[in-house]
Amino acid sequence: MTEEVCSEPGDCETARLKIGAVLLAAGNGARLGGRAKGAIEIAGEPLLLRGLRILSEVGVDEVAVVTGHYHSEVSPLMAQAERLFDDDRLVEVTQPIADHAQADSLRLGVASLSQEVDAVMVLPVDMPALTRGDLVALIGAYKHADPGIEFVGPTVGTRPGNPVLFSRRIASQIVQGQGDFGSGAWRHQRSDWLLEWQTDNLHYLADIDTPEDLDGWIQ
């Protein structure tokens, strides 16, 4: 499976999935010196709005944005994002635990999606290289995966990337707190569910974790 599958507009029109997305924006940005990643502007656009824009462009049906640390900086951006989505397709949920793990935010976000979604896409907020085409390609890989595949994630060489897309079955397990989702042990245990979708697209790896990462984007 390569990223060319479903990479053009219109390729994903048949057998349409109802997709919910979780945009993770609750972290404390400790390695970045303590900054709200969602409020960082790249080419004049805050990362939170960029992530929501490409999710809107790809046509996801619902989005849950998980905020937490720096809520006061990130939350006002949600008002600007409402123009991208109709009705109640966009919700914000706030992680109440200050010292939380990403798994806690993931569980909160997935639980905020309706039971009507067929699959869930999880996107960290700090991935400025991603485009609409990258997300469409991931959806295509998921739709064209072999029967029994429940999870598709991009893999560049041996490095797992983001975003990932998984089934309602996995979403239910996450909400119920079953297993350490996404860990090496989980991937080994659930290898029959997992498609490590091979691609050479570095967009799936590019994130902003450190000041050096950020410098590479603002210079």
Placement of each model-derived feature along the sequence:
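Short, loop-centered acidic/histidine patches that primarily coordinate divalent metals
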Residues: T155-G157, F166-R169
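Nucleotide phosphate-binding site architecture
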Residues: G29, I40, A171-S172, D215
